Every structure is written in C-alpha cells, then in structure tokens.
A protein has these predicted regions:
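An N-terminal, well-structured beta->alpha segment
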Residues: 1-63, 67-69, 144-171
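Short glycine-rich phosphate-binding loop at a beta-alpha junction
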Residues: 43-49, 73, 172-174, 276-282, ...
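N-terminal small/polar loop signature for handling phosphorylated ligands or for N-terminal nucleophile
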Residues: 44-107, 189-249
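Glycine-rich phosphate-binding loop
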Residues: 94-106, 228-250, 255, 299-338
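Gly/Ser/Thr-enriched, mixed-charge loops and adjacent short helices
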Residues: 107-229
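Gly/Ser/Thr-rich active-site loops/lids in small-molecule metabolic enzymes
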Residues: 199-201, 254-273, 339-348, 352
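Phosphate-binding and adjacent anionic-ligand microenvironments
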Residues: 273-444
C-alpha cells in the first residue's frame, strides 16, 4: 500500500498528494527519515506554507528527521524561496512543506541539498523514495520550536541584491496574496522597502476562501485587475500558495506572460554585463527568444521544471533563468527561483524607466498568445502523437512537442502531476491562433 502511495506522490521534481489519502503522517515520517539519511549534513532547514494540514505534516516529517539524531533548523511559516535562499546562505539542505498552487486538500514537499541544489527525479528524489519504501518503527512527536528562525539573514540577502534605495517610492502597485504564505512576510518586506501598495487577501488561510492560490489561471486575477484599474496603479502581482511564483499585470490589467517577463528582466539585467546567459524552458515564446538573441543574450533551452532549469543554469553558469509559467531564477540567489526577488528587480527596472508599463510591453510587439491551456486526456503520449500527425512544421521533442511554423508556434507537453496536456500557442494573428487551438482540441 505504501509503495503504491509513494508512486502516486513522488513527481519529477517534488512530492505532492492529497493529504489523508495518498499522503499522511506515516508517509511524511518515512520521507523525513529517508531525506535525513540521504543528505550528509546533520542540520536540516525546515519551513512550511499555510496549508491546513501543515502542522500534522511538520510533526511527522521532523520526527522522521530526528529519528536518526539529526537537528532541525526551523524557519517557520515562510515562502519556498526563503528556504532556498537560506539553504544557499547556510550551505545546509532544506525542505519546505507545501503543495504550491494545488487545492487545499493537497500537501507535499520540495527538497534541496546544501547550497540550494535541487533534488529532483534525476538528482536524488528517487533514491529518497526507495529509502522511504521500508517498514520502520514510526514515532511521531509534537514538534518543539527551537527558535532558530533566520529571517534576518534572508532579508539581508535580499537587500544586498536589491537595495531599498534603488526602488522609487513613486511606484504604486497592487498585491494579491491569494491567502498564501506571502502574507506572512509582507509586513517585514514593507518595513524594509516602504512599498506604496494596495493589497488584498494577505491573511494566510489554507482554506483559500477568496480564490484558489493559482495565478496561472487568469480567472483568479479578476480582483487584482479591478484593484489595479480602479486605483490607477502602475502594476499588480498575484502570488501562488507558497509564493515562489508571481504573475504580473500591467497598469491596464493585462497579464504579462512569463515569456514577456523573461525578456524584460533579462534585458534589464544584461545591461550590467558584457556577456549574459539565460536558460529558458521549451514554452518560452519564439518572439521572446528572438528579442533576447537580438540583444546578444546567450540562450540555453531545457525541459520544464525547476530542478531541470537550475541544473542547466549551474552547468552553463547562467545569469538568469525564465519559464513561461512565471518562475524566475537568479545565479546571485544560488540559481534558485524567487517571486519576491523578481518583484524587487521588476520594481527597480520600472524605477529606471519613465514610461507606463503598458507602453513598455507594447513596444515589444508580442503577437497573440493563448497562455497555458490544460486539456484532460487519457493517454498523454498518444495525444501528443495525434497532434504531431496533423501539423506541418519544424518539430522539436526536447520536452513534449514543439512545432514552429511560419505563421504560428506551439508547445504541448504532459503535466508531471496530472493526466493533462499543457498547451501554449503563439500566432501571427488571433484568427490563426484560434484555428490552431481548434485543430489541437479536435484531435484529442
């Protein structure tokens, strides 16, 4: 039974499942013990987001770690990127208890080795799975806080990367915390950076009472759009549940895609270096890639997933990494992704530009794009094969199927966590885009 559950919850780059079904305290204990055995260090950083099952998960996971006499560096209720940054700063392995943007009945774990080195399918996660698949005596005790919270180190790290003085106090923006964990760090960030901000849904509530903490679904951005437009703000940002991803909108309430953000940030950061390397995943749009190429940015393509992009960034010594899903990675942040750091860099970018954000975006002439659309399918591989058979163009199979045609481009790939196809389309016109989407949907 445990083995079947482990098969369900161990994904390509994290652990995720329905709490009380495929994931429970016994399994969390075994994973904690396995993780502690896998990493060589005697001290492990542990934090969690605001999910309703997190205290039970924390008790079980930390009990597993302590069962082999290793110590917990507890950092409390924090975003995922706080654990990553502290793992890099302290050179200690880390774990964050979270299921990111998934519904409230889910929970899980993201793990990293010392130095914020990701633990994924090909970098130790399956070894941890094997270690967890054993019959062991389970003794779960209430976790006792050891008061080792290292928040100051994290905030000092952010200040070194983006100083408060570099951000204009004239910027007015909106934040939708989505009732996720960003609300737990907002006050401290605000005290440091003196934001001129209007905010909604900052109360951490694992029931997500206002809308799902998934900003990739544009329907969840309605309240933020209204906030920005009604108050004539410069931009807005919506965070997901563990605040490692933030989706931006411009002053007109239009979503700024991950591809657009990859261009904006790389163009801004590359002005500070003669040679600038960017790792991108397969669904960053060709238009975005062409803009970066024309700016003499060195580009490296990889599969979707934070462990994949972080590994390639280390391999090629990249400065920045961008995903169309709005995860952004920085060499100066131990190659880890950080929505909070992205917000600060974006504000610094706007502080150096007098134009409205909508005008900045329009000057790039991005063609119509679909955003990420999900299709539930029975067989992912068969569905991708069907799509390939009905299109002509230049195909790439780095991750799923990408098709480059003279009038359009698309990428279709299987989800790593669900039986779904994730589809992104870009086309010269909205009419062509609609035709491509209709052709894809009718084939599957």
């Amino acid at each position: 039974m445990t083995k079947n559950k482990l098969d369900l919850i161990f994904k390509s780059y994290d652990i995720r499942g329905i709490y009380g079904d495929s994931l429970d305290q016994d399994i969390a204990y075994k994973i904690g013990k396995a993780f502690a055995e896998f990493v060589p260090d005697d001290n492990i950083i542990v934090g969690h987001d605001g999910r309703i099952s997190n205290i039970e998960m924390l008790d079980a996971f930390t009990s597993g770690i302590k069962s082999i006499n290793k110590e917990i560096i507890y950092v409390g209720l924090v975003p995922t990127d706080t654990v990553y940054s502290l793992s890099g700063l302290l050179k200690k392995p880390g774990a964050i208890i979270t299921a990111s943007h998934n519904p409230k009945n889910y929970n899980g774990l993201k793990l990293c080795n010392a130095g914020a080195i990701p633990i994924g399918e090909n970098s130790g996660l399956m070894d941890i799975k094997k270690l967890a698949d054993r019959n062991v005596e389970i003794r779960i005790e209430k976790f006792q806080n050891n008061d080792k919270y290292l928040g100051n180190e994290y905030y000092e790290h952010l200040k070194k990367l983006v100083s408060p003085e570099s951000i204009s106090q004239k910027l007015n923006f909106g934040i939708d915390g989505g009732n996720g964990v960003f609300g737990a760090v907002f006050d401290t960030l605000n005290n440091i950076y003196k934001f001129n901000v209007k905010s909604i849904y900052l109360e951490v509530d694992g029931n997500f009472p206002n809308h799902p903490a998934d900003p990739s679904d544009e329907s969840n951005l309605t309240d933020l759009k209204n906030l920005v437009i009604d108050n004539d703000l410069d931009f807005g940002i919506a965070f997901d549940g563990d605040a490692d991803r933030g989706v931006f909108i411009d002053n007109l309430g239009r979503v700024i895609s991950g591809s657009m953000m990859t261009v904006l940030i790389s163009e801004f950061l590359s002005t500070q270096k003669k040679q600038f390397r960017v790792v991108h995943n397969v669904n960053v749009s060709p238009h975005a890639l062409n803009i970066m190429k024309n700016n003499n940015v060195e580009l490296y393509k990889c599969k979707v997933g934070h462990s994949n992009i972080k590994k390639m960034m280390r391999d090629v010594d990249a400065d920045f990494g961008g995903e169309h899903s709005a995860h952004f990675y920085y060499r100066d942040n131990f190659y880890a992704d950080s929505a909070i750091l992205t917000l600060l860099i974006f504000m610094k970018l706007l502080s150096n530009n007098k134009d409205k954000l909508s005008l900045i975006i329009d000057n790039y002439n991005f063609p119509p794009s679909s955003g990420e659309i999900n299709f539930a399918v029975e067989d992912i591989n068969e569905s991708i094969s069907k799509i390939e058979r009905i299109f002509e163009g230049e195909f790439d199979h780095t991750d799923g199927l990408s098709c480059l045609h003279k009038n359009f481009w698309f990428n279709v790939r299987g989800s790593n966590t669900e039986n779904k196809l994730r589809i992104n389309v870009e086309a010269d016109t909205q009419e062509i885009l609609d035709q491509v989407l209709e052709k894809i949907s009718s084939s599957i």
